[in-house]
Amino acid sequence: MTDKPAVIRKRADFLAANRGLRVARPGFVLLAHPNQGQGQRYGITVTKKIGNAVVRNRMKRRFRELLWELLPQQGLADHDHILIGREGGIERDFGKLREELMLALRRAREGKGDPRRRRRR
């Protein structure tokens, strides 16, 4: 069995990943950014807009399990992978989330990201 990917804990690494490739899905947004040979790493962000602590932690547990399962085989080598939870993600079936993450990782490997959203001012 392969080792689990490392966890991103520093804010600077999360901000750097925001400059990388972005792949949006109904349940989450995947960010992928090269990390200068530090191996596969992952981070999870779920904002308070999603729900209370119980709901956010449940979503993070589901994302963590998916990343442990899929990143070693399908993730980008020497990249940081960030999953940002969306409101629809908590109600989605686990199998559906897995399919969406597999598709998002495939699109990231192909370099096919989604356009950035314009910020409201």
Swiss-Prot record:
Its EC number is 3.1.26.5. It catalyses: Endonucleolytic cleavage of RNA, removing 5'-extranucleotides from tRNA precursor. It comes from the Bacteria. GO terms for cellular component: ribonuclease P complex. Keywords: Endonuclease, Hydrolase, Nuclease, RNA-binding, tRNA processing. SUPFAM superfamilies: Ribosomal protein S5 domain 2-like. One of its GO terms (molecular function) is ribonuclease P activity. GO terms for biological process: tRNA 5'-leader removal. Signal peptide: none annotated. It holds the Pfam family Ribonuclease_P. Consists of a catalytic RNA component (M1 or rnpB) and a protein subunit. Belongs to the RnpA family. RNaseP catalyzes the removal of the 5'-leader sequence from pre-tRNA to produce the mature 5'-terminus. It can also cleave other RNA substrates such as 4.5S RNA. The protein component plays an auxiliary but essential role in vivo by binding to the 5'-leader sequence and broadening the substrate specificity of the ribozyme. This is Ribonuclease P protein component. It comes from Erythrobacter litoralis (strain HTCC2594). The gene is rnpA.
